[in-house]
Amino acid sequence: MNFLLTWIHWGLAALLYFHNAKVLQAAPAHGDGDRQQSEVIPFMTVYERSVCRPIETMVDIFQEYPDEVEYILKPPCVALMRCGGCCNDEALECVPTELYNVTMEIMKLKPYQSQHIHPMSFQQHSKCECRPKKETRIIQENHCEPCSERRKHLYKQDPLTCKCSCKFTDSRCKSKQLELNERTCRCEKPRR
């Protein structure tokens, strides 16, 4: 049975390889069939290709379906339109603004048990924009002084009011037969 799966795996790989080889022979390099390899690509062409936009991207199926580990998936990755490219500011990132789902047939193999073609849904991006990076927004919003320089790990802070409170709760301390000291935010032995 393992021998048969190996032959199926290699047969599919060969089929994909020869199909891609035919496509690459038929397609002009970089979209411009009349360009020579030593020719310099003009700035505007380079710039237009680099802007934030939906680009065909190879995506690992396990990245989209991490719980499918009991199967061998063929192919293991799929071509999807995803946002890619550059923004003109380091504080910006290329993100999707419009999404849609596409369903593809994927072969699911369960070693020594079964194999079947199964429809799987994937998210594609149809429009992209440059928007502020999440880390940048968090840094701009965080205007509060830290609760404690030495023991930051003991406190949590409300980002809107800057109010500090203990991460540990009184009930958590009591479950360990301790009491919460609200001044130090530590669980301590009860005083007698």
Curated annotation (Swiss-Prot):
Entry keywords, A to Z: Angiogenesis, Developmental protein, Differentiation, Disulfide bond, Glycoprotein, Growth factor, Heparin-binding, Mitogen, Secreted, Signal
Disulfide bonds: 52-94, 83-128, 87-130
Subcellular location, record wording: Secreted
GO biological process: cell differentiation; induction of positive chemotaxis; positive regulation of angiogenesis; positive regulation of cell division; positive regulation of endothelial cell proliferation; positive regulation of focal adhesion assembly; positive regulation of mast cell chemotaxis; positive regulation of peptidyl-tyrosine phosphorylation
Domain of life of the organism encoding this protein: Eukaryota
PANTHER family: VASCULAR ENDOTHELIAL GROWTH FACTOR, VASCULAR ENDOTHELIAL GROWTH FACTOR A, LONG FORM
Family, as annotated: Belongs to the PDGF/VEGF growth factor family.
Subunit structure comment from the entry: Homodimer; disulfide-linked. Also found as heterodimer with PGF. Interacts with FLT1/VEGFR1 and KDR/VEGFR2 receptors, heparan sulfate and heparin.
Function of the protein: Growth factor active in angiogenesis, vasculogenesis and endothelial cell growth. Induces endothelial cell proliferation, promotes cell migration, inhibits apoptosis and induces permeabilization of blood vessels.
Protein name listed in UniProt: Vascular endothelial growth factor A
